[in-house]
Amino acid sequence: MLIYDDSFATAMTATRQEATDLGAHVYGSEHLLLGLLAEGGPLADVVSGRDGAVTYDAVRRAVTHAIDDAPLLEGLGVSAVAAGLADAPRPRRTPRNRHSPELQAAMSAASAKWGRLRKIGELPRESRLDSTVLWLAVLEPPARSSRLVEALGADPDDLRAAVLGAAAVPGAPVPAWPTEVRRGPVTRLVHRLMDRGSRSE
């Protein structure tokens, strides 16, 4: 059975802290991306090394100023910075173990695709779940974090390929990311572990 390793646990703890610091009501993919970057580690180094625009400070500014929503807000005649300021100051509270629908959708899609690549042998079948699946989730197209990455001028598909390359067996080709797969037990397990990780102190 898969259990999570320290990289997964520390990323979830950092995600919880980021959501709390930003006064969020729920955990979103943007908090997960910030948590992954705040904790650092080999995959964070891979992502930042692939595109220097994706750093903790840059993503934090992007989240605070809602740069992913700027085109839509401007179309409505609202400044993204003004919209962000209108929401401040936010009370400091910890979300009560609720994940936003976009984060749930991204985690479901990423964990199902990741599980498929493991099943067919294109990624190692490790016994411990690490932060790889979390990185893959924040780069999924429906996730807000993916839009933030694009707004910073980076390519989520390119970063995903870098993450997959780092996760693959050394010397093996980078596996192609599946477009659609059926969700199964790995997806349910990842959701349970995320829930547990976001509750832990």
Whereabouts are the PLM-identified features?
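Histone-fold recognition with a strong bias for associated Lys/Arg-rich disordered tails
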Residues: 1-201
